Design a protein with these regions (language model features):
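N-proximal low-complexity "stem/linker" segments adjacent to membrane-targeting elements
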Residues: 1-45
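A recurrent flexible, glycine/aromatic-enriched loop bordering the glycosyltransferase active site
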Residues: 159-177
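Glycine-rich, basic loop-to-helix element that forms the pyrophosphate-binding segment
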Residues: 91-108
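Acidic donor-binding segment of Leloir-type glycosyltransferases
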Residues: 47-89
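Acidic donor-binding loop at a coil-to-helix junction in glycosyltransferase catalytic cores
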Residues: 194-203
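Short aromatic/hydrophobic "clamp" motif used to bind/position activated sugar donors
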Residues: 113
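Catalytic beta-strand/loop signature of glycosyltransferases that borders the donor
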Residues: 145, 212-219
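Conserved donor NDP-sugar-binding/catalytic core segment of glycosyltransferases
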Residues: 125-156
């Protein structure tokens, strides 16, 4: 099933299994691309989670401008016993954010993955709060409110899950706990120029009749800087993206 959804070309850089995973094990999947300065803050926030039954999957999307991969491998080796399984893989060539997330799902063996980029952070109770809603209550995904930090400070735009809310724009960030079965149902993330992969992913949830739940607590930290999706807002490709999104999801009213 997984191979039919996504075929990935990557090399295993590090893999350590402390003990066998079980139905309650959650994988935190980190997408890494040239974030040498931020990656350690991200990983420390994962290490400090109160939810102990965690695996870690770092997918390096062929970083070349800095020592991101080397730092990630060294940190993971030093902290591998904290996790059920700690894994670092590297794409053979740069494949984009959507493919990095697909690689994480395809290479993991847990029922759910928490998705985050290497420049972001999570508060210690994030996974503990989200886990029961996906593992026990059966929601396809669970997400919280964001805290912006970096170049911009403030609260995010997350709200209660409603298909109607997606008609005009995306309001749910990638940082969410997602069931592997839901990822399979929507056939993974689709690469879209300009960074609208997350919007498309959640719209595929709507298309498939999947339910997610919003937890109104501030548990995820989104770093805003010059290259973040929040700041660039994909302006250069905005009109083309609107056309593509409305072709993929005709019920959208974005751009009207």
């Amino acid at each position: 099933m997984l191979n039919r959804i996504y075929r990935s070309k990557y090399n295993l850089q590090f893999d350590h299994v402390s003990h066998t995973s079980n139905d309650d094990t959650i994988t935190v999947a980190v997408s890494l691309y040239n974030y040498e300065k931020e990656i350690l803050d991200c990983l420390e926030s994962i290490k400090n989670q109160t939810y102990r039954n965690l695996s870690l999957m770092i997918v390096d999307d062929c970083s070349q401008k800095d020592n991101s991969l080397e730092r990630a491998i060294l940190w993971t080796k030093r902290n591998s016993e904290r996790f059920v399984r700690a894994t670092v893989v590297r794409h053979e060539f740069n494949q984009g954010l959507a493919q990095a997330r697909n690689t994480a799902f395809a290479a993991s063996d847990t029922r759910a993955l928490f998705i985050m980029d290497a420049d972001n952070m999570i508060y210690p109770r994030a996974i503990e709060v989200l886990a029961p809603w996906v593992l026990d209550e059966g929601y396809a995904a669970a997400y919280t409110q964001l805290e912006f930090f970096g170049d911009v400070s403030g609260l995010g735009y997350a709200d209660y899950w409603s298909p109607d809310f997606f008609r005009e724009n995306n309001y749910v960030d990638a940082m969410a706990l997602i069931s592997t079965s839901a990822w399979q149902t929507v056939r993974g993330y689709t690469h879209m120029e300009g960074g609208w992969e997350d919007y498309d992913f959640w719209c595929k949830f709507v298309d498939s009749g999947l339910d997610a739940i919003f937890i109104p607590q501030i548990l995820c930290r989104y770093r805003v800087h010059g290259t973040s999706m929040l700041r660039t807002d994909t302006v250069n490709n905005h009109n083309d993206l609107i056309v593509e999104m409305r072709m993929r999801h005709p019920w959208l009213a974005v751009g009207s």
